[in-house]
């Protein structure tokens, strides 16, 4: 059995395949009265669209979205919202050799063994292209969260062995990531990152990196202890992005090296607002938001589609074999994954905002 739906009240179901006819999402549980247009969704899809720079796959998809249902007079009507895009630039013949030869690093083997009848073209349902549905769901939830001035910003902090260590204000991050193709706030380091990606692309290799997500203006108390803690839901949502191999909250793995005095975020009150002097917890304690900015970090693996001959097995003959991967692939998925990370975090937030009573489940007040 596959799991294509996420959320308790604000539910997002994604559909489609890399080389199928179409992809999209159905959002159920969005209250009525939210202004929502094609443009709202298209703007987000454009940020993850392939073929926009020499750092991405050359697959030329425009990803033009069409809203099929759930909108009346320019606003949501409380019924399921379905939005779809149609694939235009598939080259399925490049994947003929994958039918019985799973690619190292991809999910081909597991999909084939579990389901048997598996559309292997372009990775099928396991392709990064299916995150189009994530971004559609994220665009709708982003509009909901804007009613409460909640913003989610993801930016690249490292590519391969190149790291950005400078600290920037949130406004500077938002501004700078639009000025380069890797979506890094450090403009000098961004140039080095681009050069590194292009160097690896030239030799048929790939790389990964790290992305930080900052969520601002979140109210206190989102999260449902003990099994629906909000950090657990963020971690699940982010780990469900295919290339993500680790999630950190706040100072993350560094917390294991600190003392209690170093780790604890001390409280203070200013202008009748309770805050913490530091934010090592990343805005989440006890599985609930504490009103400070939420800080999440993800580690993204290298794109597994690389040039050259690799060892694999022939599943039909049950014998060792080799494979040489063709097709068009990203040398580094980090720049495009920022939009997907923002999307899934917004979906989690929208669901918890409704569950906590901050957003009415039936209509926008």
Swiss-Prot record:
Catalytic activity: 5-O-(1-carboxyvinyl)-3-phosphoshikimate = chorismate + phosphate
One Gene Ontology term from the biological process aspect of the record: aromatic amino acid family biosynthetic process
Binding site for NADP(+): 48
Pathway listed: Metabolic intermediate biosynthesis; chorismate biosynthesis; chorismate from D-erythrose 4-phosphate and phosphoenolpyruvate: step 7/7
Enzyme Commission numbers on file: 4.2.3.5
PROSITE patterns: CHORISMATE_SYNTHASE_2, CHORISMATE_SYNTHASE_3
InterPro entries found in the cross-reference section: Chorismate_synth, Chorismate_synth_AroC_sf, Chorismate_synthase_CS
Cofactor dependence: FMNH2
Group of enzyme by EC: lyase
Any GO CC annotation of this UniProt entry: cytosol
Highest taxon in the source lineage: Archaea
Cofactor note: Reduced FMN (FMNH(2)).
Keyword list, A-Z: Amino-acid biosynthesis, Aromatic amino acid biosynthesis, FAD, Flavoprotein, FMN, Lyase, NADP
Molecular function terms, GO-annotated: chorismate synthase activity; FMN binding
A family per Pfam: Chorismate_synt
Membrane-crossing residue ranges in chain numbering: none
Entry binding sites for FMN: 125-127, 286, 301-305, 328
Family: Belongs to the chorismate synthase family.
Biological role stated in the UniProt entry: This reaction introduces a second double bond into the aromatic ring system.
Protein name as it appears in the record: Chorismate synthase
Native source organism of the sequence: Methanosphaera stadtmanae (strain ATCC 43021 / DSM 3091 / JCM 11832 / MCB-3)
